[in-house]
Every structure is written in C-alpha cells, then in structure tokens.
Amino acid sequence: MAEFIPVEIERAKEFLQEHHWGILATRRKNGNLQMSPVTVGLDSVGRAIISSRETAYKVNNLRRDPRAALCAITSSFHGEGWVQINGAAEIISRPDALDILTYLQRQAYGEHKSWPEFHERMARERRVIIRINIESVGPKVRG
C-alpha cells in the first residue's frame, strides 16, 4: 500500500536551493505534455527560475498556457531525492531577464569565468527566464 507523504512548499523551496536538475512539463497546443530537462534555481522571493532560449517549445507552450509542473531531482536520482512543484509560469525576456540569468548562474554553477562573455552568450542565445510561482508541491508517495 502506498504511503502519502506531504511536502510543504517551504520544504520544496529548501530542496530547490540545493538541487538544480529537473524536468519541466508544459502543455502543447493539443493538450499533450511536453517535457524538457532544465537547470532550476530559486529567486530571492521563493519562485522557481529556469533559463531557456526564447524560441524553445517550452517557452511557446507557457505563453499559450502558463500551467507548469517541475520535478526536481538530486544527482543520485532515486529514493527521497525529488520534489514536484506546480504553478503558473511567466516569461521574462531580456533585458529584464539579465540580472536573473546572472543570479541563476551563480546559484546553480557558481561564478562565471567571464561575466561579459556570459552576458554576450545570453544575448546571442536569446535567453529568457521562466519564473514559476510555486502554488502546490508533491505529493510524495512511497510504496
């Protein structure tokens, strides 16, 4: 028998501060799910943040239907090392996204060897931020 284990939003946010790998699920035009591996972080007010190319399917999907689900995992993948978050996403384009892209880079990967090079790459790749307001989390089920 499966055992329901509630996950509080604050606990999920703590998880996202430490673990930056995940799979983002968005909805295609026909309603089917589209999933993408992503690097995820947490902004200063507790929203999930993800970098993406502006031309990516996930961005187009979220502009049409902002519902998003993200399964964040640890590097070990199995066991207790995951959490699901759900919420409405918004797309933040450049230049407004640049500070958040820098913040995410520092959080997930540390200092960049050349910030001018990083900013140039973000412009060249037309990077945006997907920001998800965490409305619910989990559930976690064991068994």
PLM features: what roles do these ranges have?
Residues 2-23:
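Short, basic/aromatic recognition patches
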Residues 1-7, 79-143:
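Charged, gly/pro-rich active-site loop segments
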Residues 20-21, 67, 113, 137:
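Generic structural signal for secondary-structure transition and capping sites
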